[in-house]
Swiss-Prot record:
<dbReference type="GO" id="GO:0005739">
    <property type="term" value="C:mitochondrion"/>
</dbReference>
<dbReference type="GO" id="GO:0030665">
    <property type="term" value="C:clathrin-coated vesicle membrane"/>
</dbReference>
<dbReference type="Pfam" id="PF16886">
    <property type="entry name" value="ATP-synt_ab_Xtn"/>
</dbReference>
<keyword id="KW-0963">Cytoplasm</keyword>
<dbReference type="GO" id="GO:0046961">
    <property type="term" value="F:proton-transporting ATPase activity, rotational mechanism"/>
</dbReference>
<dbReference type="GO" id="GO:0016324">
    <property type="term" value="C:apical plasma membrane"/>
</dbReference>
<dbReference type="GO" id="GO:0005764">
    <property type="term" value="C:lysosome"/>
</dbReference>
<dbReference type="GO" id="GO:0033176">
    <property type="term" value="C:proton-transporting V-type ATPase complex"/>
</dbReference>
<dbReference type="GO" id="GO:0097401">
    <property type="term" value="P:synaptic vesicle lumen acidification"/>
</dbReference>
<dbReference type="GO" id="GO:0006879">
    <property type="term" value="P:intracellular iron ion homeostasis"/>
</dbReference>
<keyword id="KW-0813">Transport</keyword>
<comment type="similarity">
    <text>Belongs to the ATPase alpha/beta chains family.</text>
</comment>
<dbReference type="GO" id="GO:0033180">
    <property type="term" value="C:proton-transporting V-type ATPase, V1 domain"/>
</dbReference>
<dbReference type="GO" id="GO:1904949">
    <property type="term" value="C:ATPase complex"/>
</dbReference>
<dbReference type="InterPro" id="IPR055190">
    <property type="entry name" value="ATP-synt_VA_C"/>
</dbReference>
<dbReference type="InterPro" id="IPR020003">
    <property type="entry name" value="ATPase_a/bsu_AS"/>
</dbReference>
<dbReference type="GO" id="GO:0036295">
    <property type="term" value="P:cellular response to increased oxygen levels"/>
</dbReference>
């Protein structure tokens, strides 16, 4: 929000509007003489005018959480009420920007103050007022038209990827008395004037919205389109939908951040909001360094991924209270782009740090601790955040659909999934990608454990798969069965060795190894494997399962005859086929293209059928 427009202590002539600091404990300040203040109202604390938010009222005493460092605040310092809730500015200029937890633009602050740290009490508006945007009004709007909340009345081409649709704020309506002609305007220029019941209102391209309030929609719709991540193990076995909620819990070093970054790089979303909430500063700087260099192809033109990304950075050394706000800031930005009709993905890395911030502030307020010292309302807060996801029909005209998908990384201490944050999250989200320390130690990445992970969206997506990839659902079921059987056989193998197993079981073990090493494992740092399109995923799985079926059939049909086929015979004769199966992943979707890869996989299937025929003859 625009902190420069909030009232200042020195401008205030009436002393009666001040409260006074009564006590300071870390980021929590208590103030007296605050009668008339509202819950979640923004205040300015002390002579440095630090931004804070009221989180508890008792008589005329208010408890305030301050979003900046409170050193130097003393008892008796003035506290000024602003009468506004914590809000964000929504308008052109969000994409490609990087904000802190309360939407202060970090690059603008650094260029104005020439400092690598954020000075205290800094006043900078979130969206720059110096940039002129080219505003194109809607064709069907003219003076006298009626317009209600959510209607799109103009378009700004923010960059070559994002058409920023300028919408009327949800609670306004009226008839148009003025609409700006096409031209260049900055974010504070009036582009629309409405009259409703004799009252005139002016609107610029920027709207302000309180972060703790959900943006209204016409109706919620069932999700039915997959969120393709480009990671085979996730797309094939545990799919998420556009508008779904996902948790990625895992111990340190399991690759949570790499998965959430690859989601932001390669997923089929239109807009990415990446909230780094209490994680290392290096991870945010890595995102800032990598994303501008990464490109995607849109209509034959190569575009930087940063053009569809906004970052909310709140690293572990920034004030704790702002960490709690950063999640709300991120989800409000996501809902705004959803209302334009885009599919938005929001990455929260990591919600555990956010819960720790809640725990710290709750401890300062001397509230009754629940499990592991977290506050009793932890589950409710998590739910209120995750429930803002979903696929919706947006308010206003023209009719459009949008969605917000939330992917929350959770880092339980010691990788223990019974930790309160993880268990509360799992009760809310629909998809669980559980990362396994043992797999990560074996350098099997992405280290998603296929036995404990699950997705509740399988049924919802069946219709989509039947339409586009008819053979996929039975393939997935078969692959899961093979992996499960392999897990059951592993115990027997440890006791009696591989040699004494039945021939069909040997095939199961070998194909499971093939699936694990050459299908589920994926190297995110190579050009051919960092992103795997869905047709390639289906093609690879199809050939592996076909090999399994043919090998089993060959063994079972010749079991009674004299020249029976065993697994060792298959392995001897099919060395080349097995090699080709395990090198299917080296086909580069960018260089080779879809048609060539599909043709190669079909050719491999034909070779396989011929090899089995000659073996049986």
């Amino acid at each position: 929000m625009d902190f420069s427009k909030l009232p200042k202590i020195r401008d205030e002539d009436k002393e009666s509007t001040f409260g006074y600091v009564h006590g300071v404990s870390g980021p929590v300040v208590t103030a007296c003489d605050m009668a008339g203040a509202a819950m979640y109202e923004l205040v300015r604390v002390g002579h440095s005018e630090l931004v804070g938010e009221i989180i508890r009222l008792e008589g005329d005493m208010a408890t305030i959480q301050v979003y900046e460092e409170t050193s130097g605040v003393s008892v008796g310092d003035p506290v000024l009420r602003t009468g506004k809730p914590l809000s964000v500015e929504l308008g052109p200029g969000i994409m490609g920007a990087i904000f802190d937890g309360i939407q202060r633009p970090l690059s603008d602050i650094s260029s104005q103050t020439q400092s690598i740290y954020i000075p205290r009490g800094v006043n900078v508006s979130a969206l720059s007022r110096d940039i002129k945007w080219e505003f194109i009004p809607s064709k069907n709007l003219r003076v006298g038209s009626h317009i209600t909340g959510g209607d799109i009345y103009g378009i700004v081409n923010e960059n070559s990827l994002i058409k920023h649709k300028i919408m009327l704020p949800p609670r306004n309506r009226g008839s148009v008395t003025y609409i700006a002609p096409p031209g260049n305007y900055d974010a504070s220029d009036v582009v629309l004037e409405l009259e409703f019941e004799g009252v005139k209102e002016k609107f610029s391209m920027v709207q302000v919205w309180p972060v703790r309030q959900v943006r209204p929609v016409t109706e919620k719709l069932p999700a039915n389109h997959p969120l393709l991540t480009g990671q085979r193990v996730l797309d094939a076995l545990f799919p998420c939908v556009q508008g779904g909620t996902t948790a990625i819990p895992g111990a340190f070093g399991c690759g949570k951040t790499v998965i959430s970054q690859s989601l932001s790089k390669y997923s089929n979303s239109d807009v990415i909001i990446y909230v780094g909430c209490g994680e290392r500063g290096n991870e945010m700087s890595e995102v800032l360094r990598d994303f501008p260099e990464l490109t995607m192809e849109v209509d034959g033109k190569v575009e930087s991924i940063m053009k569809r990304t906004a970052l909310v950075a709140n690293t572990s050394n920034m004030p704790v209270a702002a960490r709690e706000a950063s999640i709300y800031t991120g989800i409000t930005l996501s809902e705004y782009f959803r209302d334009m009709g885009y599919h938005v993905s929001m990455m929260a890395d990591s919600t555990s740090r956010w819960a720790e911030a809640l725990r710290e502030i709750s401890g300062r307020l001397a509230e009754m601790p629940a499990d592991s010292g977290y506050p009793a309302y932890l589950g409710a807060r998590l739910a209120s955040f995750y429930e803002r996801a979903g696929r919706v029909k947006c308010l206003g005209n023209p009719e459009r659909e949008g969605s917000v998908s939330i992917v929350g990384a959770v880092s339980p201490p010691g990788g223990d999934f019974s930790d309160p944050v993880t268990s509360a999250t799992l009760g809310i989200v629909q998809v669980f990608w559980g990362l396994d320390k043992k797999l990560a130690q074996r350098k099997h990445f992405p280290s998603v454990n296929w036995l404990i992970s699950y997705s509740k969206y399988m049924r919802a997506l069946d219709e989509y798969y039947d339409k586009h990839f008819t053979e996929f659902v039975p393939l997935r079921t078969k692959a899961k069965e093979i992996l499960q059987e392999e897990e059951d056989l592993a115990e027997i193998v440890q006791l009696v060795g591989k040699a004494s197993l039945a021939e069909t079981d040997k095939i199961t073990l070998e194909v499971a190894k093939l699936i694990k090493d050459d299908f589920l494992q994926q190297n995110g740092y190579t050009p051919y494997d960092r992103f795997c399109p869905f047709y390639k995923t289906v093609g690879m799985l199809s050939n592996m399962i076909s090999f399994y079926d043919m090998a089993r059939r060959a063994v079972e049909t010749t079991a009674q005859s004299d020249n029976k086929i065993t697994w060792s015979i298959i392995r001897e004769h099919m060395g080349e086929i097995l090699y080709k199966l395990s090198s299917m992943k080296f086909k580069d979707p960018v260089k080779d293209g879809e048609a060539k890869i599909k043709a190669d996989y079909a050719q491999l299937l034909e070779d396989m059928q011929n090899a089995f025929r000659s073996l049986e003859d």
